[in-house]
């Protein structure tokens, strides 16, 4: 993906916590590449117990790297003031990006109307259709390890994992109103590795670790 950024539109989803205490939730920022086939490919992420200013700083860092088409920020409960905070930071940093609106609103920010589990159930068909892909080269990264663990512990009755912060960033994908890039990006299944690989114009890059995804 990173070798072919021009073939994707990028989106950022978040779940920002308000405390760095050991008992607090994690702040999570997930970066996704969206291709012409409607697939979501995870490309980067941040997960840490920290004050919200550090998490917002991470959002801006990812924005500079990936130039996303939209950034999802939840505005419910204690997170209600995050949009204004980020808008003020845009002015201060002279860095501008689109804050995605919910499908039922024109205001910036994601406004959930159901509980966390119900929201995740709306994205579960994407997993079944193999439309959400996770990078094989990050399989040892703590961020992806946490995400895979949380996803694997979702049951029909609810979340069984201790934390659900990365799940929230996955659920937000259904609210991102994405648009597909004009460049076509095809993926080929490699039966030897069990991975989906991005077709690259440079044959030497086909099958490299950065091009390989698990679903």
Positions of PLM-derived features:
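Conserved phosphate-binding/catalytic loops in two-lobed NTP-binding clefts
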Residues: 94-119
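RNase H-like, metal-dependent nuclease domains and their acidic two-metal-ion catalytic environment used
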Residues: 1-101, 133-215
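Short, surface-exposed amphipathic charged segments that create phosphate/polyanion-binding patches used
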Residues: 112-129, 147-153
């Amino acid at each position: 993906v990173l070798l072919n950024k021009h073939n994707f539109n990028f989106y950022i989803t978040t779940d920002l916590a308000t405390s760095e205490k050991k008992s607090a939730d994690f702040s999570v920022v997930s970066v996704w590449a969206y291709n012409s086939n409607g697939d979501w490919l995870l490309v980067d992420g941040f997960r840490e117990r920290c004050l919200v200013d550090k998490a917002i700083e991470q959002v801006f860092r990812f924005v500079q790297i990936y130039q996303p088409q939209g950034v999802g920020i939840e505005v419910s409960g204690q997170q209600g003031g995050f949009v204004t905070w980020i808008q003020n930071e845009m002015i201060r940093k002279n860095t501008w990006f689109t804050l995605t609106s919910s499908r039922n609103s024109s205001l910036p920010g994601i406004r959930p109307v159901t509980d966390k589990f119900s929201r995740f159930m709306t994205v579960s068909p994407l997993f079944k259709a193999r439309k959400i892909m996770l990078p094989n080269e990050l399989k040892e990264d703590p961020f992806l390890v946490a995400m895979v663990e949380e996803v694997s512990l979702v049951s029909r009755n609810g979340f069984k994992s201790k934390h659900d912060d990365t799940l929230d960033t996955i659920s937000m994908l259904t609210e991102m109103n994405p648009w597909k890039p004009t460049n076509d990006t095809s993926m080929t299944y490699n039966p030897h590795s069990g991975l989906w690989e991005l077709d690259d114009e440079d044959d030497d890059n086909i099958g490299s670790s950065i091009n390989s995804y698990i679903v």
